Amino acid sequence: MDIRTHLGINQELSGKPVKVAEGYAEVLLKTQESMKADDKGLVHGGFIFSAADYASMLAVNHPNVVLAGANVKFLKPVKVGDEIICKARVSEDKGKKKKVLVECFKGEDKVFEGEFFTVFLIDMFWRGEKMEVKPFYWKGDKLLLLDQRKLPHQEVWLELKTYEEVAKAIKEMAVRGAPAIGCTAAYGFVLGVKVQKEDPEKVYETLKNTRPTAYNLFWALDRMMKALKEGKDIEEEAKEIEKEDYEANKRMGEIGSEIVPLNAKVLTHCNTGALATAGWGTALGVIRSAHYGGKNIFVWVDETRPYLQGARLTAWELVKESIPHKIITDSTAGFLMKKGMVDLVIVGADRITAKGDVANKIGTYTLAVLCKEHNVPFYVAAPTSTIDSNIKSGEEIIIEERSPEEVKVCGGCAIAPKESDALHLAFDITPAELITGIITEKGIFKPERITEALKD
């Protein structure tokens, strides 16, 4: 198996091996239209970095290697149509700790140079069997789901054998995060139709009606129904949805990490990491890639009331990977910006409209307004599967309203008078004009041009 398939890396966009020897590798990258960064035809640096990363993987020649780039320099611009050769050589070898020097050339001109280090060598299998942080595993006739309501103090796995159990888990937020919900629903469809032999329309409607805002849910179920009608193997289709999401997250991480300055203090909201996706993450995936890329970042983690996805889940992921961070109350963010203690904000998305409005966890709009007031860049990271081109404006999005009890009770303890009512909106809408850019696996787009990310 190609190492890129093993790790969920896009094979077409990371180049083709032309020479592999012990401790050395060369990769040829033929640039194409989809790699454009702007109207001038320049190639986004993330694709050069991806080819360099792949060359370093081949040079190290370990099936389960993960590398981090450091001292990276983009020396000359690359245009669509240019052919780039990336040459990687292992310069230091101390067992599991290796250093790889990579240089990329356009003809005789050096366009990129950098160092790559093995961060960890782990048993990481695709469709498999084991992964560092992963919210679910498909086991053929059942879905194993990490119950995120129990984190960070307990790691409890639910064994779901029916589509009704999957629907309940989605509705009650045992799983959350738009991409993870989409993947989970796809496997729920497999359980209902293939394992339980239930009516497909009934299964579809039950799963669809669990959460009204997350577009990945509808996107995944529509794709599963289409696959069924076309006579495809729906189990393989669900696996493909999972694989594509992980691959998209890795690309987003590579592309998005370029906008993160060295020594940056990054603020993020809710949980947008591996727990919210098929692995790696969207906004937190960008942060993760910047960390492993040697950016020496620090993360401010919004606690994200009332469900505390930031304090419970994002912090849990950051602790697991030793990424420096501090948890803050949601109301602290504005003061930190005023004091110059936030360099940029990166959040995820549950739905993106055709004009670039974004539905995301409640509190996102507040952060965007604060960023505009304090001149702090505000980025959204999401896969193209989150873009709903059928909806033009955020005003058309249904905002989920959840139980008031989730506001009045925290950690099992009542924190408000039982006679008091509460309003619990799960999401808000951030208008396109407040967003600096939207990071996708296809590149970084201005909000008003986001539908271009859907073009082949």
UniProtKB/Swiss-Prot annotation:
The active site is at D350. GO terms for biological process: L-methionine salvage from methylthioadenosine. It comes from the Bacteria. Its EC number is 5.3.1.23. It is an enzyme of class 5 (isomerase). Residues 124-456 are annotated as: MTR-1-P isomerase. Keywords: Amino-acid biosynthesis, Isomerase, Methionine biosynthesis. It catalyses: 5-(methylsulfanyl)-alpha-D-ribose 1-phosphate = 5-(methylsulfanyl)-D-ribulose 1-phosphate. Pathway: Amino-acid biosynthesis; L-methionine biosynthesis via salvage pathway; L-methionine from S-methyl-5-thio-alpha-D-ribose 1-phosphate: step 1/6. Residues 40-113 are annotated as: Thioesterase. Pfam families: 4HBT, IF-2B. Belongs to the eIF-2B alpha/beta/delta subunits family. MtnA subfamily. This is Methylthioribose-1-phosphate isomerase. It comes from Aquifex aeolicus (strain VF5). The gene is mtnA.
